[in-house]
Amino acid sequence: AALTSMAIGFAVTGLWWLLVTVPLIKNYKQINYVEKKEHAVRSAFRRIFETIRFIATKDKKVFFFLIAFFLYIDGVGTIIDNCINIGTDLNLSTVGQVICLLATQVVAFGGSLVFAKLSKKYDTVQLILVCIAGYFIVCLYALTLKNLIGFSFLAFGVGCFQGSIQSLSRSYFSKIIPPDNSGEYFGLYDIFSKGASFLG
C-alpha cells in the first residue's frame, strides 16, 4: 500500500508539472542567444571560464549575489529534504507524508504567484529576505511538532516560500546580468544551485 501511494504521488506530481509546463513550451520564444559554432563544447567551456573571470573581477553585484544564493539555497534544500526525516521521526504514515508533500507543491505554486504580484510593488531583494525569514520561522516551528496536524502546517509553511524564493532568486538574477550573456550566467547560477545541494 505504501509503495502504491508513493507511485501515485510521483505520478500526480509529474502530471502537475507537465500541465504547468505546457503554457511555457507553447508561448516561450528565445530572444537572446549565441550563434552555433563549429567546436560547440570547447567554445562553451571557454565562454564559461571567461564569464567566471569577468564576474569575479568586474561584476561584483552578480558575484556577491551568487555567494549569498549559494548559502541560502543550501538552507532551503536542507529544510525541504529534512521534512521527510521529520515525518519519519514522528512515525507518521507514508500516505500522510505523501499527501502533505503533494499539498506542498500546490501551495508552492500559489505562493509563487502571490510573490510574483508582490514583486511588482516591492523590491525583489526585500522579498527574498522575507522568504529567508519565513524559512527561519518554519525551522523554529519544526522543533514543536508532535503529530500529523503539526506536520501539515509545516508542509504548508515550507510550500509558501519554496517556489517563491526560487522564482524570486531567478527573477532578480535575470535583472542584474547582461541579456546577451544570459546562457553563461544562468549556467553558473545552476552550478551554484546544484553545488549547494551537493555540498549541503
Give the ranges of each region predicted by the language model.
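C-terminal membrane-cytosol helix-exit motif in multi-pass small-molecule transporters
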Residues: 14-33
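Juxtamembrane intracellular "pre-TM" segments in multi-pass secondary transporters
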Residues: 31-66
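Short amphipathic helix-loop junctions that connect adjacent transmembrane helices
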Residues: 81-97
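Loop-to-transmembrane helix entry/capping segments in MFS-fold secondary transporters
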Residues: 94-95, 179-189
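Helix-to-loop junctions at the C-terminal end of transmembrane segments
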Residues: 110-124
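Structural signature of the two symmetry-related core transmembrane helices
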Residues: 126-141
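Helix-loop junctions at membrane interfaces in 12-TM secondary transporters
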Residues: 143-155
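Intracellular juxtamembrane helix-capping segments at the cytosolic ends
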Residues: 164-177
